[in-house]
Amino acid sequence: MEILMPDPISIGDLDLVPIPGKTYFNIDREWREEFIYFLLIDRFQDEVSRQIATGSARSFGVVTPNNFYGGNIKGITRNLEYIARLGCTAIWLSPVFENNPGAYHGYDINNYLGVDPHFGTKQDLIDLVDAAHSFQKDGHPYPMRVILDVVINDSGDNWFYRGGFRYFYFNDQIFPFGDFRRPDRPLPIELRNSDWYHRRGEMRDYDHAPENQHGDILALKDYANDDDPIGSGVINALIKIYCYWIREADVDGFRVDAVKHIGELACARFSSNIREYAYTLGKRQFFLFGEIASPSDDIYNRYIGQNTSKAGWQ
């Protein structure tokens, strides 16, 4: 009889020791050789077989903007053949973690330690990764890698400023904290610390420091990831969270969201520690890449190179 263990709720609950008896997946194929298929989980497919819609028919029913449509992890597992037939060798998943209501895209996270029920379960994710790693095409091994989209710059809209007002960045001023929107979120519980957030209000200048590294992206609350004791606590917690998901799901890489809004040192520490942990599991080719959207070459240059240009971390 299989006993399902509850999801952890604290950093202290996370077991990062390799799963006994498990051989973690590794393939020495160059990442530059991969053909990566990106999909938004909710918009891809569920596990139900459907005919292709014709004319004005909609295979997913009535379209409701800014809401979930029903795609899930089992639907991806069921359609690995389709992805392989396109010639793809790796799958990049949108964030799988539990989100606030209506956040079908996955970037409004309120629980980093559990899979969003709209998408399935942790076991569904494990099964998908296992199926991708062991996939066969035309009777021959065709291992596909799986990449998770991860967020380390901000949490979801899990708390509000005092008075419930909408604050905007101004002269790097810290604004007063109101309260968390739910008594049981965010998770892990360590994220229920108002000092772990910059609290500068919404940014309007997305390309110039310090606003672009201290301000909130719309309602998403920016983590305090500066080079100080608080920032070290935040980034260390995020490192452990994502090491946990490598251990549990055996994923092969991370795409890091909103990199230009993260301090260079925090980004370097995260990247180096993630790669080192993956290596201890035998995953020698763990891949990390990040999102930078900017017209400024200077911003790109700050994050290019081994561990970035400010990688003097201890």
Per-range role (PLM):
Residues 1-40, 152-154, 166-168, 173-180, ...:
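N-terminal module-boundary/linker segments of secreted carbohydrate-active enzymes
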Residues 70-82, 228-248:
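Short, acidic/polar
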Residues 88-96, 112, 145-154, 237-238, ...:
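Short acidic catalytic loops
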